[in-house]
A protein has these predicted regions:
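Sec/Tat signal peptide C-region and signal peptidase I cleavage site
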Residues: 18-24
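Central antiparallel beta-sheet cores of small beta-barrel/beta-sandwich binding domains
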Residues: 24-25, 43-45, 75, 79, ...
Length: 119
């Protein structure tokens, strides 16, 4: 009985994980790399992790929720940020907005059209 329960639990976990894997596989290969590069640039521009955290969407695989556009120019990400803990406040109180354009291959920052106070 325990073996059956263990096998059923493992299968359920595996099936749940398949959805996440399929979602990640549908992303262009360069998108997660581009998202990580954009997030790290924002962290660097805004004083490092000791004083800045990007929005949670930038920590998702590929940051699809923060992706403004994907074109021949590259990946344009737009997201909020602020001091550590800003998203846990009620309501959340971001202090900065950042837009970063990353090359199509996810290797280079092409532009930082905006990084500053929330307009």
């Amino acid at each position: 009985m325990n073996r059956l329960l263990t096998a059923a639990s493992g299968l359920a976990l595996l099936m749940g994980g398949i959805g996440a894997v399929q979602a990640a596989l549908s992303l262009p290969v360069a998108q997660p790399k581009a998202a990580n590069l954009a997030r790290m640039r924002a962290e660097s521009l805004n004083g490092g992790l000791a004083s800045y955290r990007a929005a949670a969407c930038m920590y998702e695989t590929g940051a699809s929720s923060c992706l403004i556009s994907k074109s021949e120019q590259g990946f344009l990400f737009g997201f909020l940020g602020g001091p550590p803990g800003w998203q846990q406040q009620s309501p959340p109180r971001p202090t900065l907005e950042t837009r970063i354009l990353v090359s199509q291959d996810g290797e280079r920052i092409l532009a930082v059209p905006y990084n500053g106070p929330i307009p």
